[in-house]
């Protein structure tokens, strides 16, 4: 499966190959300051009107320049979370993993099963446990327009289902009925947690 996903690493390496590290750090500091101020404006919008729609928030606060400059501290670099977070907790004993992600991979839904299988394999290797339990929370329905096309999150859900049917000691928590069209994060946390 790695040959179909190797482009994530090569694209990143090409982007940073000739990067001036000092210039990158300067851009990163500027971005972090900008982002902190942008979040304050967004929080103020929601404090005034908790029911405000996201499009209106963007109209008032301006577009977000997220996710910031690409470089060695870029949170979405290949293996970024693995290197900055997962390795730190890997020595500790766990019974399993509850995995509730995939929203940002809707453009990769054709290979999401490979990405998820690789992730499970790597985590099991890291914890030295070929039987490490994985409970995958299936993405909810969020945008009915893309759902009709069979792309977007629908493709991710199909990949999540496939993985749970083909990889041992995995399970799937279905929450398709818990979505919210106006909020990417379902507000009904209790139902999701109970399942």
Show which residues each predicted segment covers.
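Cell-envelope and extracellular/periplasmic
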Residues: 1-195
